[in-house]
Structures are given as structure tokens and as C-alpha cells.
Amino acid sequence: MNYIFNYLGFNSDNLKKYNSLVNYVKNRYYADINIDSLVDESTKELIQKLDPHSAHISKKELSIINETMEGVFVGIGISFKMINDSLTVLSVMKNGPSQIAGIYPGDRILIANGDTLFNKNLDNNEIISKLKGKENTVVDLDIYRNSNKKIFSKKISRGKVPIKSVIAYKLMQKTGYIKVERFGKNTHDEFINSFRKLNENEKIENLVLDLRNNPGGFLFSAEKIVDQFFSSKKTILITETKRGVRDTFFTTNKGVFRKGNLYILVNGQSASASEVVAGAVQDNKRGTIIGRRTFGKGLVQQHLPLGGGDVVKLTTSRYYTPSGKSIQRSFSDGNEEYFNQANNLNYHDSEDINKLKIKDSSTVKYNSKDENFRGGISPDIQVKIANKSDELDKSILNNMITNFVYTYLDSNRDNFFKGSKKEYLNLSIDYFDTAYQKFKKLNSDKKLFDDLSENKTYIKNSIKAYYGFLLFGEEVLYEIFNDDDEYIKIAINSINKS
């Protein structure tokens, strides 16, 4: 019995050895053993020895990945967080199943189809499995609403829920801001629709494209985004297999923003498809790259079936920027060091990058065997290094603030802001002083910060941002936080100088 690939008649001595070993273990081993599990583990170990981006993906994992990349799943249309051991609704999708049923941000879901969800230390996947299901099936929920101190029941019919990958708003006069969170199947359409909406009442002359923390996605999606920025035929990227088969991808001169000033924001977690976009724009001198050196992933993967619903995400080719540069960083020191280096990219100035033992990617051209280059896309304008301890403090503080906001809003829902989104954005942060004082009183004994007053402005602004998210959606969160964002400030300064 053959347990490993006998593809197209390939039958090497090593493959014979492996199949013989599997058969011996199955038929002659002294104890019963799950041979399928053993083969599964050995397959995973084999794949792990290839490169950092090849991976075994189980049927269950693949389903989750496909939902994210397809841009739709079947559920009840909420985002949630465990706060004080209870499942708290963070946001409700507009016109989604939960909004139609009358669910609000801040509501606590206590029971789903008879299963209690509180005081169980459940992880997100366990919770999701109870809320998701087949389209038009019903989930019975018991919900607690703090504002009226009541528990009530709702029957919610599961439906298709879109997963947005694009956030957009008018940054300032004649200037649009578009955040792309991943390159999914529908990202290109989302981008075009968002741009056209921005362009409706006033022609957009400047565009800030935010690719920070974008891990990549579908290569074709990145190509279609690049295609929006050029008025003549230009190279987007080149791919090449180990056998030297090379494909070149070009723009089509059919984009929605072929003229105008383009600024792309990147950081050390901008990877893969994000780097395709940044590299094409930079090499073709179409725009300005602002930020930190990018991740450095210049390898292309394909999903190939393994059987049983599992797939191998296998690296099948390299890609090069239009000028012929490879951006792939070395992984000769192992996968752990490879990802550690990536995590440090936001915390080193360019002259300190050499301490990471990586060279400049510009030295690597087609067919180069040199794996020890720096990798990534180097920005045209570099943003000053981030302080790790400051970012950790902000991360802890943000978690405290979000927990507070959802609890506070639920307790004060009837007395809170009733105006428009525009009016909300124009509110002074002093409007949130009462909430700030309450937050400070609740958290002053937590020893995480010597004096919360030192962060007063940041806390007030964050309270405003997270309240805005609950009231008006994710765009408001970006609009408020971007007001004090260093990358955005540099982009605006560049626009004003142009």
C-alpha cells in the first residue's frame, strides 16, 4: 500500500524505503498504532524542512483560510471579545443577521443553542464553531443587556457575512486614504468601489494607500491593484521556477487612478502581495513608499491537494520586482530566526539592519544563488524607529480601554452621543473627560502604569476612537487614530510639498 506520493510513476529508492517502512509499522509493529496519524505527522515534518512559507494545511484550517480569502462566511454577523469571562459583542454588521434581530454592541451572549459561553475560558475557534453553521439555520441565543439588567432570548437565522478587506475615507481635500488589510478574492473590487466613492464629489488628486501589517494574499489581487495606477504598459512583476520558466505580468492601462500623487505606507509586517504592489510602484517611479523596510517575502506558493481535504502550501517559484530584484530574505539560520528578524524590522534604523546579518536585496538579480541579502522593499522616506516598550505599553493600555469602553457604553447607552458621524468626529476629546475619569478610577490600582495622567490625551482620544467604532463603524476608528499617526503626517507633509 502506498501512503506517499507515487506521482506520474515516480518511484525512487527513497520513496520505496518510506513506503516499506510505513507498511512494516502497519503490519508488523508490536502494538496498535494510528498509521494515518503517523504519516500525517511525518508529512508535516518533511514540509517544515523546506522553507518558512511552505506548510501543511489541514481541512479545518483550509476552511477558515478560504473564508477569509473568499471574503465571505456564514454566521450571525458580529465581532466579539471575551471580557471578564463573558462573550461581549464588539460590533454588529450593518443589515446583517444580528442587527436585524436587534443585537447591539456591548450585549453579552450567555448561551448558544443550550451551550453556556461564560466562565469557560473558551478560545475564539470554539466560540466561532457554536455561532457559525449552514446558511438559513437558526441559532438560539440567551443575551444579557447591562443597560436594562435583563436577560432575553433571540433566534437568529445564519446568513452570508462579507469580510471586508478595504477601509476608505477622505483624508483631507482632494486626498483619499485607502487601507488594504489583505489581498483577498474581492479586494480589487472593494478597492475600485471605495475609490469611486471617494472620487464622487471631488476629484481625488492624492491617494494614500496603507499596506502596513498587510500579510499578503492572492498574487492576482495585488496585480489588479497595481494595474489601477498606470497609464501605460508597465511591468508589475516577474516570476521564475527552478527550471527557469519565467512569466512577466504587465499593467493594462485601465486603472481608476492613473494620474495623481500616490503614497504607499509600509512596515516590517507588509509582506508578499503587499511587497509586489510597493515594488512595482517604486521600480516604475509611480509613487512614494513611506515607512519601514518590508518583510522580505519573495516566494510564491500554490495549494496542492494531499488527500482527505488537506493541502500542502508549496513554494513553487520566486518573484522579482520590475527591475529584476528579488526581495526574499535569507532563511539559512532557520525559520525561527527568520521570523524573529521580521519582527525586528520596525525597531532598527537602516544603518542598524546589518546587525541582523542581512545584506541589501538590490544585489540579487535573476538566477542569483546568494541567499544572504537583506530583502524587502526599502522605503523612499523612512519613518523613525518605533520604541518597543512604548508600543507594548500602548498595546496593554488599548486592551484596558477597549474592555472599559464596551462596559461603559452598555451602562450608559441611553445617555450617549446621538448626533451624526461628522458631528462625532468634530467632538473635542474633552467631551470624553467623564469617561476618562471613570476609566482612571477603575484602573488606578493596576500598577501597569505609574500615573495614567501621563497618558491622558492618548486615553481620551482612544476612548473617542473605540466609541466611534461602536457607533459608526471601523472607518471612524482609522480616522481618529490616523490624526496622530506619524506615517500619515509624513504623507500629508509630502502632499503639501508636491
Annotate each language-model stretch with its function.
Residues 326-498:
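Conserved functional hotspot residues or short segments at active or partner-binding sites
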Residues 85, 97-100:
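Membrane-embedded segments
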Residues 52-91:
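PDZ/PDZ-like peptide-tail recognition elements
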